[in-house]
Amino acid sequence: MFMFKKYLYVLIFTTSFVIGSSILSAQNIVSLTELTVHKTPTCGCCKKWVDHMEDNGFSVTTEDHQSLAMIKDDLKIQPKFRSCHTGVSQEGYFFEGHVPSRYVLQFLSESNPDAIGLSVPGMPLGSPGMEVDNRFTPYDVLIHFQDGTSK
């Protein structure tokens, strides 16, 4: 019985340490993450998405542009995956459109070989920055790779 209790205490301690370390690691990633968001000066939902990211611990700088096409072209964001704004991390990853902060955090905390960014194509209702009452349109968060593929 004594060995079982000892084993149980060690298991509980180890599990709580691992979970705690993961949470601290995720929080550190957010606190260190700076995004530059490229948007047009008149877009209201872009500002709401920036607020969503800041509310979730990201440091965000915005840059207004009359046209975003060259920026999106340089980042290799295909037209069918584009939205109204583009966030770019310090590491050069893009976050196109209304990507929820939790997916940005997950992407940045995991190893994604050959990945170049995430996107939420279009402007789906219910996504961060596109909240309208309780309306919701299901949407996909896509991961993009250097070879032009996505999933």
Residue ranges and their predicted role:
Residues 34-35, 58-60, 91-94:
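Short active-site oxyanion
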Residues 9-20:
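Bacterial N-terminal signal peptides
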Residues 1-5:
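N-terminal secretory signal peptides that target proteins for export/translocation
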Residues 28-56:
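Local sequence-structure signature of Cys/Sec-based thiol-disulfide redox active-site neighborhoods
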